[in-house]
Amino acid sequence: YQALARNVNAYAQKMIMKRENIADRGIWTAKKRYILNVWDSEGVRYEQAKLKIMGIEAIKTSTPAPCRTMLKDAFKLLMTGTEDEVIDYIEKCRSEFKNFPPEEVGFPRSVNNLQKYKGVSDIYNKGTPINVRGALLFNHYIKKNNLEHKYSAIQNGEKIRFCYLKTPNWMHENVISYIQDLPKELDLHKHVDYDLQFEKAFLEPIKVILNCIGWETERKNTLESFFS
């Protein structure tokens, strides 16, 4: 920089350059949205590479806890592994996910405006947000089944979880919310849609990254693989 300052007749040499990150691998989804496998950050050298995620909201507070860990490990594998290794890991996560109870795979949310969306002739009004709809259904069937002594009704401002349900089911609905535990008395555990939960909590966030590098989330049959 001293030589450059002389060449441009600078009054004083005040140019400096700081090293931000040195990485051996990176994936960009858009401007200022990327994942880096960083070995050196602002002059600090690491013995093991660290993941730097910028502008990619894949892991949110609304992500079920098991998927947060799974996504972090998946991103690390993206930086060091192959497409086949990532696909194998996704299948492993899918199998493990189905063994978690609804209380762990439900989407955490807060709930408000219960009275606003409560229906007069129906349980809820048209256009009710899914987490609120699940809460109104919970309150209705807890009361209908005389379970109010065991489970508190969901109130405005409470933190809840909600799960998608497979249809058909006896409730004829595709969602249920709950505060801590999904009441076994409602007989809905067997109707929890684990495939849809996994799709929205894990696959959709990771597909944003994989699509940028042309990788798949599962193996697809091709003519080449058919004849091999």
Each language-model region and where it sits:
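DNA-dependent DNA polymerase catalytic subunits
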Residues: 2-228
